[in-house]
Swiss-Prot record:
One of its GO terms (molecular function) is GTP binding. This is GTPase Der. GTP 1 binds at residues 11-18, 58-62, 119-122. Keywords: GTP-binding, Nucleotide-binding, Repeat, Ribosome biogenesis. GTPase that plays an essential role in the late steps of ribosome biogenesis. Residues 5-167, 174-349 form the EngA-type G domain. The lineage of its organism: Bacteria, Pseudomonadati, Spirochaetota, Spirochaetia, Spirochaetales. It comes from Borrelia garinii subsp. bavariensis (strain ATCC BAA-2496 / DSM 23469 / PBi) (Borreliella bavariensis). Residues 349-429 form the KH-like domain. Associates with the 50S ribosomal subunit. It comes from the Bacteria. GTP 2 binds at residues 180-187, 227-231, 292-295. One of its GO terms (biological process) is ribosome biogenesis. InterPro entries: G_ENGA, GTP-bd, GTPase_Der, KH_dom-like, KH_dom-like_a/b, P-loop_NTPase, Small_GTP-bd. Belongs to the TRAFAC class TrmE-Era-EngA-EngB-Septin-like GTPase superfamily. EngA (Der) GTPase family.
Amino acid sequence: MLSYKKVLIVGRPNVGKSALFNRILDAKRSITESTYGVTRDLVEEVCKVGSFNFKLIDTGGFTILKDEISKIVVQKVLSSLEKVDLILLVLDVNEILLEDYEIIERLRKYSSKVILVLNKVDTKDKEFLAHKFHNLGFKRYFLVSALHRRGITKLRDFLKVEVGRVNIEEEVNIKVGIIGKPNSGKSTLINYLSGNEISIVSDQPGTTRDFIKTKLTRNGKVFEIIDTAGIRRRARVNEVVEYYSVNRALKVIDIVDIVFLLIDVEEELTSQDKKIAHYVTKKGKGIIIVFSKWDLLEESKGYFETLKGRVKFFFPVLNFAPIFRISVYKKIGLDSLFKEALKVKDQLELKTNTPDLNKMLNLWIKDYHLNISHKIKYITQVSTNPVKFILFANKIKNFPNSYYNYLVNNLRKIGYKNIPILVELREKIRDLK
């Protein structure tokens, strides 16, 4: 795996860390609402400046609050200080608070790699405010406005020289999104896979808000794994931040090859799980149903087979999807899960040529004994990943579902067994472009 130097952004809540993170990246990755404590996880991204790369890490706000999540966030920040090459300490140029002094004291032992970034210097008139920060003892500093992009180019150029490495692109063979309800075990899984606690693990639902990326090699292939905030029913999304997280999770589905739909084995499958599955299949993405926390279950003989039967009965939209059980703590099922993901990816990349398809189509039509007025004329595969076919018929109005399903089931038998198949019906061959 490629190794980049790491730059950690730290500071109390609402000094503009995530806005600065996005500006340095020149992309909108972290959620940046003006809500106290919005970023909770370590959000990592490779930053590209010209032909140089480094890893940029956004952190949760350093706070003196004593609730469980705040304490976990602070501990995560402190445990990261030793591991990084550079620390950007972000302060609000307009004020310095008790929490600022608290983190400054924690950074004293790392002062050689601390860069002071005074944010919210929105106009040139505010630059004079910087003088009150000189006595903090940090030799290197930058004046920026993340909101107005002031000073960002200068800071990016500095980081390029200080920690940048020549850009060598690493091929990603497969992208996997970890999707599911809050507290279904997503963060525990990605922390195990990455070897770092980059996503907060807690028994409070909704502790991951940003999406978390990590790369790993399994079976000789490079996986990019993306963990997301748990998807809730839209009716329950009553915070701006949660709204952004739900939409970001849906956007993650758009960019990955395969989704691991995590379901807590102690909970019943829900209509929300079904909605997620519908969205995934509509997009033509691979999907593997993963029952997590299997170690918590007192399993009776044959229970897993019963569970699989229930999924296929109550969720027929997923009747093609592989179903696995895992336990991160007992290391159950993880190797098999990744092997299956590679098999699904191979199916997504399968392309069957048009002459062979139409030879098989003629056989399928002959074997279909019901007498119907709808006649299939031609079939062609127009894309892979997502796999999509176009069927041309003499008419498509009131096309029988049973006939449609019969054709799809036959397509599955030629190599598309465990993936969604998109099939579009058209009436005229000349419509194909």
